């Protein structure tokens, strides 16, 4: 029955779930509205709400956002577990600054060499423009946490149960935001789904518990996330990692058919949140 319910959630249209949209103060009012940083709020039924809220940072290589898979479908899944979901639209690299045409591809690092990423920096192509976009997105992510805290009573959210779930590049954005957050911007938990750090990692003194999920054969990503896990542990912070052996790339919410262990990642997320006390009743 749970598998059937999850399968149905995968096809829930956006219009049924999005309840509120708020532009973030980090955006420029002169920007096209479709590009301005904003949050989209998806709230569970009030009688189901447990006070937990997850800010969803979708992937897309810092050039687009995988909104349907990483926000809309995940919001339906989280709402079904009593969790508020906050989709984040952050600054993107739409002005170039990537790898020049004809340039050699960066080396692909496998999971056995996390040492190739000092300070867990798994960004293979640093440049001034690209790094500036990451920093802008980082500010968006921090503003999102702050806005959720400011609306916590209105949205039936516990201020101490707000965290990130980042996918791919969105994981890098969430990690960067966590490292530089002030008290009101600080997440209570940090989850990265195949999203390594895009900047050198300095673990904050008050680092939140970290959950990492990825596939072992995902080039650069798996090694970068092992390096991130090690940085958290070396700092004495709480961290957990799930390294799935099947498949070699990104994935999304999926029904559990038994075909791969990766299918269980969303269940592991809920179990982890529950074990950390974030799903206990308000």
For the regions a language model picked out, list residue spans one by one:
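Serine-hydrolase catalytic machinery in alpha/beta-hydrolase-like enzymes
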Residues: 27-54, 59-155
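Bacterial Sec-dependent N-terminal signal peptides
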Residues: 1-20
């Amino acid at each position: 029955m749970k598998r059937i319910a999850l399968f149905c959630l995968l096809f829930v249209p956006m219009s049924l779930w999005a309840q509120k949209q708020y532009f973030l103060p980090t955006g420029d009012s002169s920007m096209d509205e479709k590009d301005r940083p904003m949050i989209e709020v998806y709230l569970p039924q009030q009688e189901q709400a447990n006070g937990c809220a997850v800010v969803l940072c979708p992937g897309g290589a810092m050039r687009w956002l995988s909104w349907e898979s990483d926000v809309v479908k995940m919001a339906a899944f989280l709402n079904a577990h009593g969790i508020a979901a906050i989709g984040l639209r952050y600054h993107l690299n739409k002005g170039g600054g990537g790898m020049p045409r004809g340039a050699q591809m960066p080396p692909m690092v496998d999971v056995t060499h996390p040492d190739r990423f000092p300070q867990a920096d798994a960004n293979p192509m640093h440049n001034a423009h690209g790094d500036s976009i990451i920093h802008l997105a980082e500010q968006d992510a921090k503003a999102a946490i702050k806005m959720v805290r400011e609306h916590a009573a209105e949205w039936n959210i516990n201020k101490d149960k707000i965290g990130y779930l980042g996918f791919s590049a969105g994981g890098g954005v969430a990690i960067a935001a966590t490292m530089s957050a002030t008290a009101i911007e600080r997440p209570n938990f940090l989850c990265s789904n195949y999203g390594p750090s895009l900047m050198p990692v300095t673990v904050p003194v008050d680092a939140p518990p970290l959950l990492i999920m990825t596939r072992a054969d995902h080039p650069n990503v798996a090694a970068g996330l092992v390096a991130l896990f090690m940085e958290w542990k070396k700092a004495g912070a709480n961290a957990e990692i799930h390294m799935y052996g099947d498949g070699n790339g990104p994935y999304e919410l999926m029904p559990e058919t038994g075909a791969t262990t990766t299918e269980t990642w969303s269940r592991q997320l809920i179990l982890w949140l529950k074990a950390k006390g974030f799903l206990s009743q308000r």
